Design a protein with these regions (language model features):
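Membrane-interface interhelical linkers
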Residues: 1-13, 43-77, 126, 178, ...
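Hydrophobic alpha-helical transmembrane segments of multi-pass membrane transport proteins
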Residues: 9-17, 21, 76-93, 155-166, ...
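Membrane-interface helix termini and inter-helical loops of multi-pass transporters
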Residues: 20-31, 59-62, 91-97, 139-145, ...
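C-terminal-most transmembrane helix of multi-pass membrane proteins
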Residues: 146, 244-314
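Glycine-/small-residue-enriched transmembrane alpha-helix faces in small-molecule transporters
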Residues: 1-34, 137-169, 294-314
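C-terminal transmembrane-helix exit sites in multi-pass transporters
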Residues: 107-127, 248-267
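Hydrophobic/aromatic residues within transmembrane alpha-helices
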Residues: 25, 33, 37, 92-93, ...
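Helix-helix packing/entry segments at the starts of transmembrane helices
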Residues: 102-107, 174-184, 221-255
């Protein structure tokens, strides 16, 4: 559980850095950036899985594929659901649609909570219920303010929960499954990088892009790998609520990139920030209670050992 929380927080922090990191990838456009993100992430992910001993997961899925060739259909669908989200994540800030994308990440945790409660019968604590209510207020206000839900928002909010749910159904909810998501899109990435637009010429003209692409691969591996592992270790409800840290960081990143929160948008963001604060407080109180229980248990064990020593024959 704690491992999942740490991984989720690490993923959110890394995604916040990545949102800002797009500035270092100019003048690559969103398609070129996406292509190089896929091409640079897979080697880092493979290296990490070799180091952690998870590379066998890739072979495990390959064996399943040989036994049931129809599994390739799921791998293609999984890759599409995953990688189109990664493309949109980069496309948004580059094309001035960062806040629409970030609103999708505001709505996403609510959909995740709904999936957890309905499909997995998971229960919410009082703190989590309060956080959900605040989140509903913020998201509802934003939908009312905009008058509609942008397609970027809807796609983020719906496709990700579907992706994580189906990963559990098809038992690919581990790094091996994510490796296949990236591997399936590599032909598309090569086409976008080399043929759709000659990004090699752009990189040759701007040599700093070589290091920027390497950094993109490392950060993507760190963030996405942590995110995928967190989805495996955490219940759907907790995983969804912890995801609220990400849109908070994305909103700040969007403002750093030049977008601004207007006066009528604050009723969207303040309730979300309060929801995140409640989750942090709940987590902190839970940690304090756990530490107290551990101390009390240690004291009881010490007292018991002392009584046993007193009763033992001298």
């Amino acid at each position: 559980m704690y491992k999942g929380v740490i991984l989720s927080v690490l993923a959110s922090l890394t995604f916040g850095v990545l949102y800002f990191y797009t500035e270092f990838l100019k003048p690559l456009d969103s398609e070129q950036t996406f292509a190089w993100r896929m091409l640079s992430t897979l080697p880092f992910l493979t290296l990490f899985m070799w180091w952690s001993g998870d590379l066998s997961r890739v072979a495990e899925i390959f064996k399943r594929l040989l036994q049931k060739p129809q599994l390739i259909l799921w791998l293609i669908i999984s890759s599409f659901l995953c990688t189109t989200q990664l493309w949109l994540f980069l496309w948004g800030p580059i094309n001035g649609r960062g806040l629409e994308v970030s609103l999708g990440y505001f709505l996403l945790p609510l959909v995740m909570v709904l999936v957890g409660c309905v499909l997995y019968k998971e229960k919410l604590s009082y703190w989590q219920i309060a956080a959900v209510v605040l989140a509903v207020i913020g998201v509802s206000h934003e939908i009312w303010r905009m008058g509609q839900i942008a397609w970027e928002t809807a796609y983020v909010a719906v496709a990700y929960p579907l992706y994580f749910f189906l990963r559990r159904v098809f038992k690919t909810d581990h790094l091996g499954g994510f490796w296949w998501d990236l591997a399936c899109v590599i032909p598309v990435a090569i086409y976008l990088a080399a043929f759709h637009s000659n990004s090699f010429a752009v990189i040759a003209h701007f040599p700093h892009l070589i290091w920027a692409v390497i950094g993109l691969g490392f950060l993507s591996c760190l963030g996405l790998g942590s995110y995928m592992l967190a989805s495996r270790y955490l219940p759907f409800v907790i995983f969804g609520l912890l995801s609220y840290l990400e849109p908070v960081l994305l909103a700040f990143a969007s403002m750093v990139l030049g977008e601004r929160i207007s006066a009528d948008e604050w009723l969207t963001y303040v309730p979300i920030w309060l929801a995140v604060l409640l989750l942090v407080l709940e987590g902190s109180l839970h940690l304090i209670q756990q530490q107290r229980k551990q101390r009390a248990l240690a004291q009881n064990v010490a007292a018991l050992e002392e009584r046993l020593e007193d009763k033992s024959p001298k």
